[in-house]
Amino acid sequence: MLTDMDISSRASLKNITELGADLGLLPEEMMLFGHTKAKVELSVLQRLAGQRKGKLIIVTAVTPTPHGEGKTVTSIGLTQSLNAIGQKACACIRQPSMGPVFGVKGGAAGGGYAQVVPMQEMNLHLTGDIHAVSSAHNLGAAAIAARLFHEARLGKTEFEAQSGQAFLDIAPNEIRWHRVVDHNDRCLRQIHVGLGDNNGPEYGSSFDITAASELMAILALSHDLADMRARIGRLVLALNTQGQVITAEDLGVAGAMTAIMADAIKPTLMQTLNGSPCLIHSGPFANIAHGNSSIIADDIALRLADFVVTEGGFGSDMGFEKFCNIKVRQSGQAPAAAVLVTTLKALKANSGLATEVDSNAPNIHVPNINAPDQARLEAGFANLNWHINNVARYGIPVVVGINRFATDSDAELQWLMEAVNASAAFGCEISDAFSQGEAGAIALARTVVRAAETESQFKLLYPDEASLEAKLSTLAEVGYGASGVSLSIEAKQQAQQLTALGYGHLPLCMAKTPLSISHDPSLKGVPKDFVVPVRELVLHAGAGFITALVGNVMTMPGLGLKPGYLKIDIDAKGEIVGLG
């Protein structure tokens, strides 16, 4: 089979204006970027304000493994197949960060014959939204550092006299707004700024990857430009010496930050291999952020299509949970059905029997993940069953989609389908979207349509009015199956402080490992009798949630021993090669 890159480069594409017209966009509602992509103007929402909305489908997965489960492949393949059976469908997915593209994970355009094309344009830069987020974020960091410098240099009276601005009395050790870059760069996790003469008071700081920026979350959760402007104004950049918050509005930088992102709020329209529309917008990670594409993209697509297929990052304990408890809480748009993606490989890897973790230990034999192994499959089914029940907990009909690999055993696939059909799932189908494109997920598409016709009884996991401690306990015990939650001394103090400042009503965004339902990546399958350790609570007042840092999760990844950039180059024709 051809590589993803080869398939993408050989694709016959619709002109982007034709694609937009087929979706229902007017020419003036598209800002063209060449022939293959266009920004969608938000004026379309005003034109279609009274339009009946389509049905939203959320795609999630079992606990992820290094083998890849094919969640984006399924999202794109399902969209293609829905259009093939006569439904009008549109996909809504996140913009890939270049950190994973050049790291281990690679691109995020799907794969095989179920991908967004041209995939190299999607995976590298696209229309510049992530750069806009980085620039706006770093403007805020530069502004707070400059204000600190001038206030320290002049003192209150002289500063106010010369600048005409209020003295903010910034506490250097309470600056909460650091810097971001769209790369994996571990050496930037801890830095000191202000070093040297006349460069400002020294203070400790850091870099996060741009996908972890609160501005990225704001981009994903805003309803329109005015809402984004208001949210940016609420950003808490620092505390003063009395412990009071200093916002971007207080600093006078919110307007300029918004101006940088004025075009970034518009989703980007691209197409799949069979010419199905796909809106790409925002890129928050699901382990260290809320992990879903934008409310605006969903809203536009739902007014133009019968079915909108979106996805949450990683497993149902991660992006799906945050889709429900953060995104739906703010959008008011509940899903009609969910698709839970799994593979035979994923279940064997999640079995807890000679897993990849064990392979790091000497003298332990790890079976071939592609070989039939009924014992590992049955043990790993517990993980799938947990995720089925987790999705069903939210009152959503769940369809299991099994991504077929060429090495899969027919007998094992049959056993898995029978096991799923005896579970709480609405249905189960095998998908060959990777190898067959739109023809490979027809059965999945038909079952999803039937599931979406049932009456969804969507419900949130916890109410707004619950205390922060109660929300943490619910997420740990109900959301992950933990026996409890433990807060560090710092986290307890932060919970009290955030409640006192009036932020206790906000939902929680759990930042934890995606490689286990628990906080510990070595605990496979369905962990039991564990306590979730919360080390820190971080306020994101603009985005409208509080992040709980769990275990050893980091907001700046690092490059591995064999990073993806080693394979990427330009050939003699000037074409990008090695991207996948």
From Swiss-Prot:
Gene3D superfamilies: Domain 2, N(10)-formyltetrahydrofolate synthetase, Formyltetrahydrofolate synthetase, domain 3, P-loop containing nucleotide triphosphate hydrolases. GO terms for biological process: tetrahydrofolate interconversion. InterPro entries: Formate_THF_ligase, Formate_THF_ligase_CS, P-loop_NTPase. It catalyses: (6S)-5,6,7,8-tetrahydrofolate + formate + ATP = (6R)-10-formyltetrahydrofolate + ADP + phosphate. It comes from the Bacteria. Keywords: ATP-binding, Ligase, Nucleotide-binding, One-carbon metabolism. ATP binds at T65, P66, H67, G68, E69, G70, K71, T72. One of its GO terms (molecular function) is formate-tetrahydrofolate ligase activity. Pfam families: FTHFS. Pathway: One-carbon metabolism; tetrahydrofolate interconversion. Its EC number is 6.3.4.3. NCBIfam families: PRK13505.1, PRK13506.1. Belongs to the formate--tetrahydrofolate ligase family. This is Formate--tetrahydrofolate ligase. It comes from Shewanella baltica (strain OS223). The gene is fhs.
